[in-house]
């Protein structure tokens, strides 16, 4: 079997948002294609295979074009049906160049996109400054913090719309945009349209030219509402995707913050949770939640003024704050521990010890089922290893040097209290636990 007849389905695929402004219409590759072409992400039977998916940047009508230099007609092995496999995941109204009129039809769609309008209710808008292509990389930070007026000629305007299955035309629109979840979210799957508890927040760029406005898709998130006894609900953020041309520019944070603000205003919602977050999303969420707690006059200032940040914590007060901020227990604990780290006196050995006990106890109780499967020495080793990883991550996030907390040398604060001394306290604090409704962690990498 010639290797030249095998193609990687991910690197062979190129996506382009046709009509997207300011240079964001360049082709980009998906992150995953295994939901479509199998775990090996390999397509057999073609040489020089190229899968081009052109998408109208507003309406998201797709045009599929599959080309190759040669097809292995001589083989007795099964040749993969490239178009047949991907069309199972495309919206029913997709176009394919296997039809002679498809290119012309797609050109008509792109022209008609000038009349496209976002579906649903606008819930937020924000601006970013226009950046020259040559300066884009160095200007990411300023883009994220721009507060230009929407009427400023140097402003780019972005809008977020909320939709449900009841929004006219949204079911059809969602069938087009859901493909991006498979291509950019590991483990994603399509959601069921007969489940009525879904809602969606979609991000667009709004472009004004010659007194006309057009809207161009950038990403979206889906949320699911769970009923909670007796008369409240939890909202679970299920899927979250920002397409590659718009990443690393603060748009993910803007979308997440908008969702959080919307949820927090709902009196009958107890908390916002996230379904199996990736490490990238954890960082995005941590940064935005932390920024909110550190806002002038906010939680951190209030807690510090009341001397509430030192371990052991006032559990009743902390829980009341969690309910007020509507963060899930694990996420609340993480950002709270970051705020505590920022206010920790690392020269105070007792403060350091109590902080370490608190963090380890939280890790232990959230992962007790997994840890109990290990020998006692392995438990202690894994707990210490995870603690060190967590604190290093926190230090990177908040800009605190944590070397003294982790130093195992004779003069390091971390060496003053051994695992034997802490073990009983860690496990004793583990008796009280939060239930997040999602069951135990799925893998050890999620210990923290």
Swiss-Prot record:
Region Disordered: start-end pairs: 407-448
Annotated protein name in UniProt: Histone acetyltransferase type B catalytic subunit
EC number: 2.3.1.48
Residues carrying the site annotation Interaction with histone H4 N-terminus: 198
Region listing for Interaction with histone H4 N-terminus, in residue ranges: 39-41, 224-226
Family listed: Belongs to the HAT1 family.
GO cellular component: chromosome, telomeric region; cytoplasm; nucleus
Keywords: Acyltransferase, Chromatin regulator, Cytoplasm, DNA damage, DNA repair, Nucleus, Transferase
Lineage: Eukaryota, Fungi, Dikarya, Basidiomycota, Ustilaginomycotina
Enzyme class: transferase
InterPro entries reported for this sequence: Acyl_CoA_acyltransferase, GNAT_dom, Hat1_N, Hat1_N_sf, Hist_AcTrfase_B-typ_cat-su, Hist_AcTrfase_HAT1_C
One of the GO BP terms on file: subtelomeric heterochromatin formation
Binding site for acetyl-CoA: 240-242, 247-253
Main location: cytoplasm
A molecular function GO annotation: histone binding
Entries under Pfam families matching the protein: Acetyltransf_1, HAT1_C_fung, Hat1_N
Gene3D superfamilies (UniProt xref): 1.10.10.390, 3.40.630.30, Histone acetyl transferase 1 (HAT1), N-terminal domain (3.90.360.10)
